[in-house]
């Protein structure tokens, strides 16, 4: 028994709008995690034997409980300092269940035997779900990103344990109450609370794990997964570029880039964090972008007004500030915003457009995770592609051009798992296409498309011999 089990631990959480440590929770003990996983294993077999339509029906019952729980919405609002995005996170549950049900029907449909290379042998595949899947969620979209892994895992027939981020823990308690309203689901889905130590205990007990977070922590998670000999599906950081060609409309491009850079205060891994614009339209583009950036307002003091919320994690404010200061010290020009603002105890930053940047600056090389938009000009499209690929990240990217054909000709050369053409950040709302994570932006099977569910199965093959006479021992030997 560990010291944690004997004494227990309590963690405090900061309110992003007030800056106050106004919430605390007791960490789930390691022994409790072992008990939870054991209970889930006992319930998983019956869950996996249900049809996918039956599992979807149970999940839809949960969605109704979630949508009617005002305490859950209020807790998520307090966790993130955002009202409209919190509302959207909760609303996404119902549509996500429907989306995965459609995909699941294709996976689970009856398949006839397939002729093998041997004339008398056919085969068919069987999908066996992992018994217990673990999920370690992030703080930027604490409910939504958890759902992206949780729903397909449950639909596949796995039981699931979720550890949300300790930065945004308030929503866990009311969410657990909604699970209790659907006992069948509560038997195969549980939430635990804690920090990195808790995450390690989770990895030690599950059969597969999904992680969303930083590259640094992701590497530790992957190492631990290897030691436990379980698959890890990790989506890590990003430094997404957009290339704007000379034939693009500078005004429309500015609108797209601003939205993709500052939505959710830039606290999204697929936010645009680097802009490469052709020199012939750069001035017009920057003029439009700055004008739009200066029109963005904070949702303070009224959370239901304004465009962007506070910085959820106070340490992220320090990173953003260091990136801006580093750029200024190296000769960059701040065209809008440029500082961390304190309002009511919370930390906020208005859209910060930065010109005269290069790849010696942190703001062009490291993940900023805030509404900071560094703009770099180029003269040759091959130079733009080289710059876009000059990064340790490869999550996603975008190309804005005169038409989609021109954009596609550029996109195929970008080293990233998903490239939006004639838009930015399409993967924030479209999950149909499969993508992998390039470079240090992640590892493991895609969380999108059919593979988003298939990754929770082990594939089994059944071979059937149809020959009337099978080979006996007389067929052996060296004759």
Model-derived segments and spans:
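N-terminal Rossmann-like NAD(P)+-binding subdomain of aldehyde/semialdehyde dehydrogenases
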Residues: 1-121
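Structural signal for hydrophobic packing residues in well-ordered secondary-structure cores
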Residues: 44, 48, 63-73, 80, ...
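ALDH superfamily catalytic-core signature
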Residues: 217-358, 421, 471-472, 477-479
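Residue-level signal for inorganic ion chemistry
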Residues: 19, 55, 157, 189, ...
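Rossmann-like NAD(P) dinucleotide-binding subdomain of oxidoreductase/dehydrogenase enzymes
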Residues: 112-252, 378
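Conserved C-terminal structural/oligomerization subdomain of aldehyde/semialdehyde dehydrogenase
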Residues: 18-24, 341, 348-479
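A short hydrophobic/small-residue beta-strand
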Residues: 159-161, 334, 418
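Short, well-ordered beta-strand elements within core beta-sheets of diverse protein domains
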Residues: 22-28, 42-49, 135, 242-244, ...
């Amino acid at each position: 028994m560990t010291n944690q089990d004997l004494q227990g631990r309590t963690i405090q959480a900061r309110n992003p709008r007030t800056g106050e440590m106004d919430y605390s929770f007791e960490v789930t003990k390691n022994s409790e995690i072992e008990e939870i996983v054991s209970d889930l294993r006992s319930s998983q077999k019956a869950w996996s034997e249900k049809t996918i339509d039956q599992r979807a029906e149970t999940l839809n019952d949960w969605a109704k409980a979630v949508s009617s729980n005002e305490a859950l919405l209020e807790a998520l609002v307090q966790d993130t300092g955002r009202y409209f995005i919190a509302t959207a996170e909760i609303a996404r549950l119902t549509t996500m269940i429907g989306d995965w049900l459609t995909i699941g029907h294709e996976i689970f449909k009856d398949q006839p035997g397939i002729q093998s290379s041997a004339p008398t042998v056919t085969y068919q595949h069987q999908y066996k779900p992992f018994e217990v899947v673990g999920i370690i969620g992030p703080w930027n979209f604490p409910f939504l990103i958890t759902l992206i892994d949780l729903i397909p895992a449950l639909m596949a027939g796995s039981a699931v344990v979720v550890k949300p981020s300790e930065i945004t823990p308030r929503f866990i308690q009311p969410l657990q109450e909604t699970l209790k309203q659907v006992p069948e689901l509560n038997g195969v889905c549980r939430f635990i609370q804690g920090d990195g130590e808790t995450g390690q205990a989770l990895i030690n007990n599950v059969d597969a794990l999904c992680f969303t977070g930083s590259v640094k922590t992701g590497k530790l998670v992957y190492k631990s997964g290897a030691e436990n000999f379980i698959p890890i599906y990790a989506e890590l950081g990003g430094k997404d570029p957009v290339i704007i060609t000379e034939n693009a409309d500078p005004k429309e491009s500015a609108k797209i880039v601003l939205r993709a850079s500052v939505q959710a205060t830039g606290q999204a891994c697929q936010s645009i964090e680097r802009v490469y614009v052709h020199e012939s339209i750069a001035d017009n583009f920057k003029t439009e972008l700055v004008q739009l950036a200066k029109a963005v307002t904070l949702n303070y003091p009224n959370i239901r007004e304004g465009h962007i919320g506070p910085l959820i994690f106070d340490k992220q404010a320090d990173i953003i500030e260091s990136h801006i200061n580093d750029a200024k010290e190296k000769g960059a020009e701040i065209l809008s915003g440029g500082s961390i603002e304190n309002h009511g105890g919370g930390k906020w930053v208005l859209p910060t457009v930065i010109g005269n940047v290069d790849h010696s600056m942190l703001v062009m090389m490291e993940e900023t995770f805030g509404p900071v938009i560094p703009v770099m000009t180029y003269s040759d499209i091959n130079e733009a592609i080289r710059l876009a690929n000059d990064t340790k990240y490869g999550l996603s990217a975008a190309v804005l051009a005169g038409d989609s054909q021109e954009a596609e000709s550029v996109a195929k050369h970008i080293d990233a798992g998903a490239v939006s053409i004639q838009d930015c950040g399409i993967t924030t709302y479209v999950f149909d296409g499969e993508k992998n994570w390039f470079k240090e932006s992640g590892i493991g099977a895609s969380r999108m498309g059919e593979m988003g569910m298939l990754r929770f199965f082990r594939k089994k093959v059944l071979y059937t011999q149809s020959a009337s006479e099978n080979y006996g021992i007389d067929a052996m030997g060296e004759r």
